[in-house]
């Protein structure tokens, strides 16, 4: 639930800034073309800025320690495994990092296939067998090779644009309706209009989050398939089985969680960035 809240809050922050800037610049929201252009600038702008700084943000947020020179055999094996899988997948070697967390998790991030980061938690590194870890690493390398970071950024940009545009169009319709039934023809007034826009931003933002989560789940299945090709189906299934036996992951922020191996669980599957582990295992066994 915390992941969902953070995702919605981030989108709402972008939308709120867009509203303030539009008001300051006097953008006429009744002009559909101008509104759509402005919505696209903010919708895609925020998404691509997040993508551009994603690797830097991940290192700072998670306290990732990039392995430049392996200190022991475990770190050496980790780097060599990622290097081998990256070569198999046809991508540039990602940076490899470790972050301190008891959770068994890992994630991939970065603005492109040739500028990426694969990070694993200490809980995963020392709590799984090498075969299981190899499956996890293959999953993350597949995310990079599939271009999932860019794909979901584009999807996020589209839905952000939709939210900004649709909320203000609907608010304009409501304002016109109130104005036509008001003797003075003043409409909602600035503060009431902003309140209506905020509520609509929130409602459309929830819908947008569901759409992004749907596409994220599809990308998870694709990353599992890619991992099965890189490391073998048995290793990927073993990794998922191990994760299923463990506690829910709790320590990863939303932006990294979307590309992690183990997502947050939710009563409503449509709000989850990852399919249930049982479904992922079943899909691999059926493939």
Swiss-Prot record:
**Residue stretches spanning the membrane:** 4-24, 33-53, 154-174, 195-215
Q: Does the keyword DNA-binding apply?
A: no
Q: Where does this one sit in the cell?
A: Cell inner membrane
Q: Which cysteines are joined by disulfide bonds?
A: none
List positions binding Zn(2+).
139, 143, 220
Q: How does it sit in the membrane?
A: Multi-pass membrane protein
Cofactor annotation comment: Binds 1 zinc ion per subunit.
Provide the active-site residues from the annotation: 140
Q: Name one GO cellular component term.
A: plasma membrane
Per UniProt, the keywords (alphabetical) are: Cell inner membrane, Cell membrane, Hydrolase, Membrane, Metal-binding, Metalloprotease, Protease, Transmembrane, Transmembrane helix, Zinc
Instruction: Identify which cofactors the protein needs according to its UniProt entry.
Output: Zn(2+)
Q: Which domain of life is it from?
A: Bacteria
One GO term (biological process): proteolysis
Q: Hey, which family's this protein in? A: Belongs to the peptidase M48B family.
This one is known as Protease HtpX
């Amino acid at each position: 639930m915390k992941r969902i809240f953070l995702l919605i809050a981030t989108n709402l922050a972008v939308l709120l800034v867009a509203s303030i800037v539009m008001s300051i610049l006097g953008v006429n929201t009744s002009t559909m073309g101008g509104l759509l252009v402005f919505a696209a600038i903010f919708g895609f702008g925020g998404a691509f800025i997040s993508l551009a700084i994603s690797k830097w943000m991940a290192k700072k947020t998670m306290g990732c320690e990039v392995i430049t020179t392996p200190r022991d055999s475990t770190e050496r094996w980790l780097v060599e495994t990622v290097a081998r899988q990256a070569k198999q997948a046809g991508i540039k070697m990602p940076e490899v990092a470790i972050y301190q967390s008891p959770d068994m998790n890992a994630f991939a991030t970065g603005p492109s296939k040739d500028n990426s980061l694969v990070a694993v938690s200490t809980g995963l590194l020392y709590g799984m067998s090498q075969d299981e870890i190899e499956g996890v690493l293959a999953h993350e390398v597949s995310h990079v090779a599939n271009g999932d970071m860019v794909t979901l950024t584009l999807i996020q940009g589209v839905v952000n644009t939709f939210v900004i545009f649709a909320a203000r169009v609907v608010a304009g319709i409501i304002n016109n309706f109130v104005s036509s039934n008001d003797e003075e023809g003043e409409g909602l007034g600035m503060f009431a209009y902003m309140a209506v826009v905020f509520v609509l931003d929130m409602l459309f933002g929830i819908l947008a989050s569901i759409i992004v989560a749907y596409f994220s789940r599809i990308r998870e299945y694709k990353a599992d398939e890619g991992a099965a090709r890189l490391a073998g189906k048995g290793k990927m299934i073993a990794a998922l089985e191990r994760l299923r036996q463990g506690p829910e992951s709790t320590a990863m922020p939303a932006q990294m969680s979307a590309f992690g191996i183990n997502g947050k669980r939710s009563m409503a599957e449509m709000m989850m960035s990852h399919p249930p582990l049982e479904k992922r295992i079943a899909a691999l066994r059926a493939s």
